[in-house]
Structure formats: C-alpha cells, structure tokens
Amino acid sequence: MGECMLKTNICGIEFKNPVFLASGIMGETGSALKRIAKGGAGAVTTKSIGLNPNPGHKNPTIVEVYGGFLNAMGLPNPGVDEYLEEIEKVRDELNRMDVRIIGSIYGKDEEEFAEVAKKMERYVDIIELNISCPHAKGYGATIGQNPDLSYDVCKAVKKAVKIPVFAKLTPNVTDIIEIAQAVVDAGVDGLVAINTVRGMAIDIRAKKPILANKFGGLSGKAIKSIGIKVVWDLYENFDVPIIGVGGIMSGEDAIEYMMAGASAVQIGSGVYYRGYDIFKKVCDEIISFLKEENLTLEEIVGMAHE
C-alpha cells in the first residue's frame, strides 16, 4: 500500500517512485545499474556517455572533503556504441523491476549531442543532456554557461529524438534563469538541477592541489541548500517538470526538494553514505512523512510556494 503512494508520472512516463540514481560514478556498467535498481530506485541514470571512448582525467580524480566529495573524473566512458551493449544486458531485467532508464549524454557541439541521442533513443526512456559538467574543458559547463550554445544543443537533440529530453543545469553561472530560459525556449521537456559546484582541495604537505585536474566539482551535503534554491527559482519561472539533485541523503532532504518544486529527485553521493539501498530507505522515509501529514506526493510538489 505504501509503495503505491509514491507512483508518479513525468512527461507521460510512469515511475514507481520519484527517487532516482543521479548520473555519475555508479552508472558505468549494466551490472552497476542493476545493483542500484535492486536498491529501490525508481529510475537509474547512466554515466554521461559521449560519441567516442574517453579515458577521462588522470588520478587522483576524487577526494572526500568536509560535507561531500570533490571529483574531476573528466567524463570517462567507453563511447556510446559500446555502452549500449551494457544497457542491452540489463534492460529487460530493469523493465521487469519497473525501473526506468535515463540516458545521460554529452558532446562537443549540437551535432555530436544529436548523434549520441539518436543512438541512445531506443534504449532509454528519457535523454538527459549534460551541459553542466564543471571539469571537462570544451564540454559540459562550457556549453551550459552560454545561453546560445545551450539553446543550439537542446534544439538539435529535440529535433533528433522523439522521447522526452531534460537539460541538466550548472549552478556555476551568474544567472541560471537565463540559461534555463534558453533551454526551455529550445523545447526541452524538463530540467535537472543541479550539477556539482566548482571547488578545490589542496594538500598542504605536497603544497599543491589534490586532484590531478587541480579543481573539480563538489557534491554531497554541502550543496543541498544551493540545489534547493535553484529548484525553487526554476519552479517560480517555468512550467516544466524539475528533477532535483544535490546533497540528498534522506527522505527529509528529498521532501525539501519536492516542496521547492521538484517532481522527482536524484541521489549520487548519498550511495556512499547510506549504501546501495539508500533509494528504498529514502522512499520509506517519504512514505512515513506522507502518512503522518495525511498528504499525497502530488500535493507536496511546490507546496512551499503556497
């Protein structure tokens, strides 16, 4: 009975619950996606996949810091053709588990984005455009910090595929509404916010930055308040579904994002703190809250704006 309380519909797609895996370190292989699905996620988001194989940055690429993690992976992936074989291995099993697949993609320009999207379309339920990675020069936030480039990429992908397209936004901008307006004008079906916040850690003994890339993206508890404010602002300005991400560790965190305006949430760093079954734990905590407050999931989305 409780699980039925969490069923949600986004862009015509039914999800058994609104607690998803975020794109990142956990989505590299089909087996990793399956492990997360078994942990209770309503959807799994792949690692960001490009047209060609990419080794990413040299190690060290991740370090734990106060309040979360700094990572500069550099978008490592096997390329879309090889990665689709990973999805193929687990797609039927995920479908039997009623778990949807969100395909995160990146590219250097609109043509590359569109080509990857077309290849991935029949394997996933939603395309998520990574125009927000803060540590891959020429990719990600290089596009997502420019409204014109963001518009061009989103317009090209919307033209290339028929399934819903969401744009994942970077917080590393002066005016995120300007960027969001550009991608909404280009026709995206929804928004994902936020990606990681640019940061750095220095080894005072070695007297140099810890990450090989020098700087990276901060994820985890430290960025939750930033993410919630961005979701709040997006909800105030746009009439498209929003997926909230950044620092979600508990049902209470997820509910905060939903009350700010998110229709669903994604969890990344939280897997390290609470295990693969964090998705079930968060779902159970949301259900308990809804029962205690005599509310429905639909009612809490945007509730803090009333």
Swiss-Prot record:
* Annotated metabolic or biological route of this protein: Pyrimidine metabolism; UMP biosynthesis via de novo pathway; orotate from (S)-dihydroorotate (NAD(+) route): step 1/1
Write down the InterPro entries for this protein, in alphabetical order.
Aldolase_TIM, DHO_dehydrogenase, DHOD_1B, Dihydroorotate_DH_1, Dihydroorotate_DH_1_2, Dihydroorotate_DH_cat, Dihydroorotate_DH_CS, Dihydroorotate_DH_I
Q: What is its main location?
A: cytoplasm
Give the reactions, separated by semicolons, that this protein catalyses. (S)-dihydroorotate + NAD(+) = orotate + NADH + H(+)
Q: How is the cofactor bound?
A: Binds 1 FMN per subunit.
Gene3D superfamilies, per database record:
Aldolase class I
One GO biological process term: 'de novo' pyrimidine nucleobase biosynthetic process
Which branch of life, at top level?
Answer: Archaea
This protein's assembly is summarised as:
Heterotetramer of 2 PyrK and 2 PyrD type B subunits.
Q: What is this protein called?
A: Dihydroorotate dehydrogenase B (NAD(+)), catalytic subunit
What is the species listed in this Swiss-Prot or TrEMBL entry? Methanocaldococcus jannaschii (strain ATCC 43067 / DSM 2661 / JAL-1 / JCM 10045 / NBRC 100440) (Methanococcus jannaschii)
Which gene specifies this protein's sequence? pyrD
